[in-house]
Amino acid sequence: MKAVLKHELSGYFHSLTVYVFGAFLLVFVGIGSMLYNIQQAVANFEYVLGFISLIFVGLVPILTMRVLAEERKQRTDQLLYSLPITTTDIILGKYLALLVVFLIPLVIVAFYPLIFAKFGDVYLLTSYGSLIAFFIMGAALIAIGMFISSLTENLGMAAGICVAVVLFNYYSVSLADYISSSVIGSIIALVVLILIVGLIIK
């Protein structure tokens, strides 16, 4: 697993992916901080994280679409499976590498509440609690993106399905209002959803 982790991190830091991801995340955090914490003088940093959470729709597919789909497309996945490591080690190594890439800009963001606290009252406990929740949500979406990437070798399809799944995750509560609360209605909705996903993957 360590070998896969080192290899993946080396690949990320020798490409633009990690830098573009980090730059976009920090730019949007900066915009959110300016709008809420500076212009409106709001002491809650969690509002900023709530504001920027929708960027996962674009960033997660970009970050995850190549993880396994590219391996299948170039047939290098067979080389990985021939190594004296388990499939679990390969997946965990790739996943941990993505988490490191995601965590790096968040370490920088972690200093924002402390900086704002020097100029006013900031709720540090809720700010860092929200930051941890933000990381957990990102980690979950990255795991979903990795799974989708494993289903196809088409990078565009992997990204498109990931965008659809992330959007569904955000708006599932709103969509629930349009679905019957009865058992039969729920089963029909689930079957339709499974068929749609199956057709997309096919």
Regions found by a protein language model. Give the residues of each.
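Helix-loop-helix units of permease transmembrane domains in multi-pass membrane transporters
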Residues: 67-97
